[in-house]
Structure formats: C-alpha cells, structure tokens
C-alpha cells in the first residue's frame, strides 16, 4: 500500500481493517474477495451496467474495484452491439490515484461512442467521483 489514495480519511481505517482481515485468509489476496469481484457487466434493457464497487485499485483480484476490470468491461460494452448505453453503477469511497486518469480518459472517450452515465449507488467519493464525472451524466 505504498501508493497515493484518493478517498475520505474516515474510509482509510475501514480499508486497512479489511486488508488486516486478509491476514487470516491470505489466499483472498490472490483470488480476491468473492463479494467484491468484478462481474464484467450485466445487460439490462440494452444498457450495459458496469459495477464499480469498493475501493478503486489498479488490478482486480486482491481488493475492491480493479481499474483493469472496469476498463475491460467498458471496452467489451463498447464492442457489444446489444449495449445501446453504458451505466457505471458506483458504490465506492475512491481509491488509488495512479491509473485513475487513464480510466477517466477511457470513460470520456467511451461517451463519444455510446451514451454513458454514472449512478451513485451509495458512496461515490474522490477517485470514484472523478470517474463518474467523466460520463457527464
């Protein structure tokens, strides 16, 4: 955790506590926490719903919402002719700064190809808000 994070200070204790709990289940660091794993996207009425749940991290698998998984889901949704629009379903306190600009740029580019929006499904702060704002909806 030697990276700069953009999230509310009070969330730092929660993130650290969850990481500490992984000490008793180190395999979770490799496989990821099942309840937080990205599921790609779900197509609902022609809308690709991409979940962004938990702290935003660089790579999916060990914790939170991986920027790589969100970017991959975004790319797949753009290529899917059944997806007329893209919705980021966000419940996140924010996360790492590194890589967020690149993902934000990808979201901004996506909105030039398909209608994009973000839904703050609870907390949407810091780096998560940055990503949401790139949809402009």
Residue ranges of each PLM-predicted region?
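N-terminal organellar transit peptides
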Residues: 1-137
């Amino acid at each position: 955790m030697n990276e700069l994070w953009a999230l509310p200070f009070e969330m730092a204790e929660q993130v650290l506590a969850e990481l500490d709990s992984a000490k008793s289940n180190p395999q979770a660091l490799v496989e990821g926490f099942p309840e937080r794993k990205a599921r790609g996207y779900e197509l609902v009425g022609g809308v690709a719903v991409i979940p962004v749940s938990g702290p935003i991290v660089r790579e999916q698998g060990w914790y939170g919402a991986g920027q790589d998984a969100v970017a991959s889901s975004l790319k797949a949704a753009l290529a899917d002719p059944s997806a007329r629009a893209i919705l980021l379903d966000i419940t996140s306190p924010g996360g790492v700064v590194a890589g967020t600009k690149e993902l934000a740029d990808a979201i901004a580019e996506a909105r030039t190809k398909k209608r994009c929006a973000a839904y703050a499904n609870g907390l949407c702060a810091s780096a998560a808000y940055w990503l949401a704002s790139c949809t402009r909806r």
